[in-house]
Structure formats: structure tokens, C-alpha cells
């Protein structure tokens, strides 16, 4: 998204085209996870239990662990909170901020400030920093805001099922390996922990070896038309107006 705002026109055009395709990928991913959540809720109601593993479903607590993992490693992809490289790329017009043209400022950022979360003296607090150096963090903030929208849709599935559980995004300091939070350990609420505390509790928040083994055990191919794996609900919509039982793929 930042490269789509590039002042180098060939790069900008290419990335804008890629974003159109990426929107489809995001839709498939979000609705796919939603179908897993729907199936879990269906099994919980059918068997009146939170533990749906014996019935071939992935329990909500395990899904939360995977959410914690993927969100935290995705936050690392945006790089350091303060970055001179990002500032230089912005100054050269190679990259921009998300929806740059909609931001009401001078787009030069020489005298602008931005609030960034920092960790000093074993405390997490907000600090005003030069906005030009915090381009990465602004993109990370935009990513977190967008992730919240998807989370609400998954939580709506759970709410509609009448189940007292809600997914939540972990704190941005949780399980980080890049940036200023890489040197500390924090729980999903942002409380700083000692290494001993982290080691003793991390499997409460992240997928354990047993969790990985269980999920992998469910990955059994289902190729018969009209049938679907037991851990995911059927899609709500139709593809090309064909019924769910249609033989979309033929195996020879």
C-alpha cells in the first residue's frame, strides 16, 4: 500500500494493480477464517461444549492463539518504529503513507510529529517523535486498524451464535522480534514479563506443539463433490451460480 503511493509512476501503477488482486486474497482469507469460526460455533451449540476437538473442530481458544501468532509476526513486517531508511525512501518519493492523497498535511513532514509507543526503563509509554522517521509505525497503525475490522466480523459470528467469547488483538509489544519490543517480553495485554514468566506462560497465548499437531491431524483431503472438511463450514455464496455440490475440480 505504501509503494502504491510512490512518486515513481511505474512502481505506483504496478502496486495499485497488485492491490486489486490482493483485495481478493484478503477477502478469501477473511471469509475462510470466518467459516472456521462458524463451524466451531456450530459444533459448540450442537454438543453443548467449548471443547470441540473430539468432534473435529478447532476450539476458539486455539484459534485465538493462532490469531496472536499471526498478528504479532505480521507487525514485525513493518520494520523498526523509527527508521532513517523509511524516512529517506519517503523523501525520495519511493514510498508513501497509506492513502497519502487523503492525508491533510504538506506531505513533506519536516516539522510534523507523530505519537509512537516506546519501551523505556521497563515501562511502555507514548512519545512524540518526528513524523518523517515514523513512517513505518504509521503504516503499522493503519494495519492494526484494518485488522480490527476483520476481527469485528469474526466476533459478530460468535455473537450471533449466542456464545460468550470474543477474539481480541494482542498488544503490539507481544511476541515481537523486530523493533524496540524485540528485547522485552509482554503478555497479550501489554504487561511486561520476566523471561521466566514468559517461558512458563507463552503456551497459553501461542500455539504449542500439541496445538500444531492437532491442527495438522485435521488436514485430511476431502475431494468428493458436496462434502467438506469437518473443521470448516460450507461457503455461504455460490461460485458462478453453481450449487455447492457442483464438481468444480475433476481428478484423473
How would you label these PLM feature ranges?
Residues 10-23:
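Alpha-helical scaffold segments that form or flank carboxylate-/histidine-based iron centers
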Residues 45-252:
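Extended, helix-rich structural scaffolds rather than catalytic motifs
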Residues 1-2, 32, 230:
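Domain-scale activation on soluble regions of proteins
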Residues 20-34, 40, 44:
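Extracytoplasmic, non-cytosolic globular domains
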Residues 1-12:
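Helix-loop segments that flank and shape redox-cofactor active sites
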Residues 10, 36-37:
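Long, histidine/aromatic-enriched segments associated with O2/redox biology
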Amino acid at each position: 500500500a505504501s509503494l502504491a503511493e510512490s512518486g515513481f509512476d511505474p512502481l505506483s501503477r504496478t502496486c495499485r494493480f497488485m492491490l486489486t488482486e490482493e483485495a481478493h486474497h484478503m477477502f478469501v482469507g477473511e471469509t475462510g477464517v470466518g467459516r472456521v469460526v462458524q463451524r466451531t460455533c456450530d459444533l459448540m451449540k450442537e454438543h453443548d461444549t467449548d471443547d470441540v476437538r473430539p468432534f473435529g473442530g478447532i476450539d476458539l481458544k486455539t484459534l485465538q492463539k493462532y490469531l496472536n501468532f499471526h498478528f504479532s509476526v505480521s507487525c514485525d513486517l513493518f520494520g523498526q518504529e523509527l527508521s532513517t531508511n523509511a524516512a529517506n525512501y519517503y523523501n525520495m518519493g519511493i514510498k508513501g503513507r497509506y492513502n497519502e492523497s487523503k492525508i491533510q498535511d504538506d506531505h513533506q513532514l519536516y516539522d510534523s510529529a507523530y505519537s509512537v509507543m516506546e519501551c523505556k526503563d521497563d515501562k511502555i509509554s507514548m512519545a512524540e517523535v518526528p513524523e518523517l522517521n515514523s513512517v513505518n509505525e504509521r503504516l503499522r497503525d493503519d494495519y492494526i486498524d484494518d485488522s480490527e475490522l476483520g476481527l469485528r466480523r469474526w466476533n459478530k459470528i460468535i455473537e450471533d451464535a449466542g456464545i460468550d467469547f470474543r477474539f481480541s488483538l494482542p498488544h503490539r509489544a507481544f511476541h515481537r522480534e523486530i523493533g524496540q519490543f524485540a528485547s522485552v517480553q509482554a503478555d497479550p495485554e501489554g504487561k511486561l514479563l520476566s523471561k521466566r514468566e514468559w517461558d512458563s506462560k507463552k503456551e497459553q497465548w501461542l500455539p504449542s506443539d500439541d496445538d500444531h499437531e492437532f491442527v495438522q491431524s485435521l488436514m485430511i483431503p476431502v475431494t468428493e463433490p458436496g462434502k467438506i472438511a469437518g473443521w470448516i463450514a460450507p461457503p455461504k455464496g455460490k461460485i458462478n451460480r453453481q450449487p455447492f455440490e457442483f464438481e468444480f475440480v475433476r481428478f484423473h
